[in-house]
């Protein structure tokens, strides 16, 4: 089949990311592109955060079905094994990004109808709540700080599935036993391959927070005696 060229939306996202990579032009701590799963775009987003050194990219991943085909229709249920393999084959290695899976069901505010959204949509709420009730260096996960504004996860998970996702540095989102209607993030890994404190989101965000505060102090002292 002949190539149709790059997706126009991917090209636009990459152009925007090139602007965001400039610290002098923009300021932010978290980067999210809900529903953007293209490897070319997500790789560029990771590079942008690494170049800035003061932001974490929270990413959605490519979903594969049970037949190992890339899912284009959100109604198709993901095949966990093939999704993990697809992600692992990218061999991403960075402490400036974190991946979540799967999509979740939320209520549309206008009419309370259920809608399926990428995991990053729910995780932005988790991160915001974590920072409001605690601090960026607390883990945005678990029963205390990891609850999403959602009522169902697209994939039902047992312990084996949870472990497989976590071993692949994919943070699982699921409904724990006995908590029907409640969805939680149960992982806070970055994509750093080596065992290190920086393989955890809260540690990377702590260092980002320190770096930003030191920068602000330095700016205030600039040109002072």
Regions found by a protein language model. Give the residues of each.
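Structured, hydrophobic secondary-structure cores that serve as assembly/anchoring elements
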Residues: 11-225
């Amino acid at each position: 089949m002949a190539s149709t060229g790059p997706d126009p939306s991917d090209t636009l996202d990459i152009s925007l990311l090139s602007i965001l990579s400039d610290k002098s032009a923009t300021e932010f701590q978290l980067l999210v592109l809900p529903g953007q799963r293209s490897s070319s775009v997500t790789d560029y987003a990771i590079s942008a955060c690494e170049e800035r050194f003061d932001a974490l990219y929270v990413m959605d991943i490519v979903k594969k079905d049970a037949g190992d085909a890339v899912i284009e229709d959100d109604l198709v249920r993901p095949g966990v094994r093939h999704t993990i393999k697809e992600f692992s084959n990218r061999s991403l290695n960075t402490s400036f990004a974190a991946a979540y899976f799967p999509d979740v069901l939320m209520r549309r505010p206008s009419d309370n109808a259920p809608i399926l959204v990428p995991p990053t949509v729910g995780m932005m709420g988790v991160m915001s709540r974590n920072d409001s009730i605690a601090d960026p260096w607390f883990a945005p996960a678990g029963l205390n700080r990891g609850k999403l504004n959602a009522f169902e996860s697209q994939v039902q998970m047992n312990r084996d599935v949870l472990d497989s996702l976590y071993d692949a540095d994919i943070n699982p989102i699921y409904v724990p036993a006995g908590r029907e209607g409640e969805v939680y993030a149960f992982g806070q890994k970055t994509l750093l391959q080596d065992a290190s404190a920086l393989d955890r989101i809260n540690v990377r965000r702590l260092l980002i927070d320190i770096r930003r505060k030191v920068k602000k102090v330095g700016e205030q002292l600039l040109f002072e005696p």
